[in-house]
């Protein structure tokens, strides 16, 4: 468990998260309007979205199905009876004067998700609920010095709000939870998890306490838009609360915003309670009643989920838990790996995928779907290493050319004459030459200077242009030098 260190001792973090995930749907939750990101302002707005008088909402069945599948992925209870409520508040980008949400009877509740901790153990985070609600529009304050404008394109887009219990004990655990949840949503296909575009947003409820004490007063940090900022925002807010308490002041329950530039939270408004919103069932919408048949059908349609894949990669492919988790975290990377793993050594493939391919993709700020190297060609590169056609060092050169051009590994090796030298007769000739040219080093090595062995290996590699088989060079050198 992580602690906040202060002059008076250690303080514990107590953190709960609320994740707002936009449902990947072509139309909105209660209207047929489109949901394309970055469309021109107010180009995807129906009379329902604009709350014109007499317009009635019609529930999008697909959004309901996506919420159910997400709930099943969270090992949660899917409620066969759920109700939409009106959450009443006024804001300029909420044309109805209320938000349609689910307060009393959510569609999903009582789920769990396991996350890795700093000790390497798994920790279970309880999911209180997942409910459906509509997103608000967007206020635009940078278009004019005199006016604010409203874009209702986002108004009415379906959201899943996923609420955890306050089981999270550090900023890093919060980040791990969000990363794992994002991965799950992408596998299920219910949300693309793109925090930069706002399709996944995080609110963090943060309080502090000394060990063994009751829960402290919590503050909510709204709309955190990146994994890194989740850590920064929670760290700052917790430290702020500790400083207040140690100075004899009280923590006021409030809603904050995090400023990514200053790294600080600032008060947005006092924290509302449920009573402030005057929730009541929406009279325009019938309760959602689900059958066992539908729930079972959606459960059967779920793909292999991240935890299942990790177990498979460990047992079937022999990967380490770490390697399996890194690959499975990105669904596209997992598909790429599985396609290539049928053609080569999975362990060696995983090593190259994580250390070389992911590294190059990060440098290029590219996704694996944009990679010019096909899974089949990547597997062929690994096979060339496996059968000693090329050395690991040469393979890195070949890989870099493949990444830039998309050329097949065998063609690059052939064109550039990079085949590894594994002929003992050829290597013995080179080794004899190295020994002949370096009598002092030979004498020093035989006199006990073992580190000189690396010098001889380096000389052989230099003379062969790095193409000598390293393992065979080591073996032959030891024979020649009598070690």
Curated annotation (Swiss-Prot):
PROSITE patterns noted in UniProt: GATB (PS01234)
GO biological process: glutaminyl-tRNAGln biosynthesis via transamidation; translation
EC number: 6.3.5.-
Molecular-function annotations in GO: asparaginyl-tRNA synthase (glutamine-hydrolyzing) activity; ATP binding; glutaminyl-tRNA synthase (glutamine-hydrolyzing) activity
Keyword hit for Magnesium: no
Enzyme class: ligase
Catalytic activity: L-glutamyl-tRNA(Gln) + L-glutamine + ATP + H2O = L-glutaminyl-tRNA(Gln) + L-glutamate + ADP + phosphate + H(+); L-aspartyl-tRNA(Asn) + L-glutamine + ATP + H2O = L-asparaginyl-tRNA(Asn) + L-glutamate + ADP + phosphate + 2 H(+)
Alphabetized UniProt keyword annotations: ATP-binding, Ligase, Nucleotide-binding, Protein biosynthesis
NCBIfam families: gatB, PRK05477.1-2, PRK05477.1-4, PRK05477.1-5
Family: Belongs to the GatB/GatE family. GatB subfamily.
Subunit and partners: Heterotrimer of A, B and C subunits.
Functional note: Allows the formation of correctly charged Asn-tRNA(Asn) or Gln-tRNA(Gln) through the transamidation of misacylated Asp-tRNA(Asn) or Glu-tRNA(Gln) in organisms which lack either or both of asparaginyl-tRNA or glutaminyl-tRNA synthetases. The reaction takes place in the presence of glutamine and ATP through an activated phospho-Asp-tRNA(Asn) or phospho-Glu-tRNA(Gln).
Matches recorded under HAMAP family: GatB (MF_00121)
Name of protein: Aspartyl/glutamyl-tRNA(Asn/Gln) amidotransferase subunit B
Naturally occurring in which organism (per UniProt): Rickettsia bellii (strain OSU 85-389)
Encoding gene (name): gatB
């Amino acid at each position: 468990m992580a602690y906040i260190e202060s002059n008076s001792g250690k303080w514990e973090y107590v953190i709960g998260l609320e994740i707002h995930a936009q449902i990947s749907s072509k139309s909105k939750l209660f209207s047929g309007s489109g949901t394309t990101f970055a469309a021109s302002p107010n180009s995807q707005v129906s009379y329902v979205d604009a709350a014109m008088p007499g317009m009635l909402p019609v529930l999008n069945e697909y959004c309901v199905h996506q919420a159910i599948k997400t709930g099943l992925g969270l090992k949660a209870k899917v409620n066969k009876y759920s109700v939409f409520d009106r959450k009443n508040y006024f804001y300029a980008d909420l044309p109805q004067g209320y938000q349609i949400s689910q307060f009393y009877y959510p569609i999903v509740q009582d789920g769990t998700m396991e996350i890795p901790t700093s000790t390497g153990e798994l920790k279970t985070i309880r999911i209180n609920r997942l409910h459906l609600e509509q997103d608000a529009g967007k206020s635009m304050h940078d278009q004019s010095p005199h006016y604010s404008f409203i874009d209702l394109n986002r108004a009415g887009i379906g959201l899943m709000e996923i609420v955890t219990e306050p089981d999270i004990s550090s900023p890093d655990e919060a980040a791990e939870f969000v990363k794992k949840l994002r991965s799950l949503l992408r596998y299920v296909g219910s949300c693309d998890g793109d925090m930069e575009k706002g399709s996944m947003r995080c609110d963090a409820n943060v309080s502090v306490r000394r060990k063994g004490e009751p829960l402290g007063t919590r503050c909510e940090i709204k709309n955190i838009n990146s994994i890194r900022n989740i850590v920064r925002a929670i760290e700052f807010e917790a430290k702020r609360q500790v400083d207040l308490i140690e100075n004899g002041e009280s923590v006021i329950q409030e809603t904050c915003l995090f400023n990514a530039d200053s790294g600080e939270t600032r008060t947005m408004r006092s924290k509302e309670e449920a009573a402030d919103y005057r929730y009541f069932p929406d009279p325009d919408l019938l309760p959602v009643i689900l059958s066992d048949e539908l729930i079972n059908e959606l459960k059967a349609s779920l793909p292999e989920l991240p935890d299942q894949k990790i177990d498979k990669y460990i047992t079937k492919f022999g990967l380490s838990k770490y390697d399996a988790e890194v690959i499975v975290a990105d669904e596209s990377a997992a598909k790429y790996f599985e396609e290539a793993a049928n053609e080569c050594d999975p362990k060696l493939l995983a090593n190259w995928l994580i250390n070389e391919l992911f590294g190059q993709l990060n440098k290029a700020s590219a996704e694996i779907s944009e990679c010019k190297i096909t899974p089949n060609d990547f597997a062929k590169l690994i096979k060339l290493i496996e059968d000693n056609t090329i050395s690991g060092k040469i393979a890195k050169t070949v890989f870099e050319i493949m990444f830039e051009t998309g050329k097949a590994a065998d063609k690059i090796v052939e064109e550039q004459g990079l085949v590894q030298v594994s002929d003992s007769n050829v290597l013995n000739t080179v080794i004899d030459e190295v020994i002949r040219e370096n009598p002092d080093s030979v004498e020093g090595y035989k006199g006990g200077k073992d580190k000189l062995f690396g010098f001889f290996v380096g000389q052989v590699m230099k003379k062969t242009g790095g193409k000598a088989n390293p393992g065979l060079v080591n073996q032959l050198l030891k024979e020649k030098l009598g070690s």
